[in-house]
Amino acid sequence: MLRGEEVELPRFNFNLGKKEYKGDKLRIDEHTILILEGIHALNPELTPQIPAASKYKIYVSALTTISLDDHNWIPTTDNRLLRRIIRDFNYRGYSAQETISRWPSVRAGEDKWIFPYQENADVMFNSALLFEFAVLRCHAEPILTSVPRNCPEYPEAYRLLKFIKYFTPVQDKEIPPTSLLREFLGGSSFKY
């Protein structure tokens, strides 16, 4: 692609666990703006052939800035995990139990492949929304309550259920289709 050749772009099918090619093709030239999106896009090992002066790096993460009270702050990992549970359920066919089970591996991958490079970004964008937990509650509760009590993931599901009950539920009909929250809830006007 960087040599100007046309390439076929794959999409990852999470239900099948593999990438698929469906005829989406792309050719770029020296005037094309190339946007690399994804959690690994800041890793310089992925783009050594692109000069540093030609890159503008943006780090996007849900950096929660609210607290339950004066003493109990909300970890950004809870926001990200709730988003992931809902997204995985809606788009990947994973149960909350499966997502919670994978979470330690996801966190280890972040520590190794994402967080070391976040400081290299030219700008950081906080994607957390002040009203987000109130909306996530409506989606997360039924998914989290399906985790069986006798499985190892139940304590985490129970903790998250207790946590989101602090927020008055807000129905997502109030959320416009252009909101980034729609990436997780569904109903977006954008194609992912």
Q: Where are the regions that the model predicts?
A:
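Structural recognition of the conserved hydrophobic beta-strand(s) that form the central parallel beta-sheet
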Residues: 33-37, 58-59
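ATP-dependent small-molecule kinase phosphotransfer cores
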Residues: 1-34, 94-103
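Conserved NTP phosphate-binding and transfer environment spanning the P-loop NTPase/kinase superfamily
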Residues: 44-192
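Short beta->alpha connector loops
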Residues: 39-42
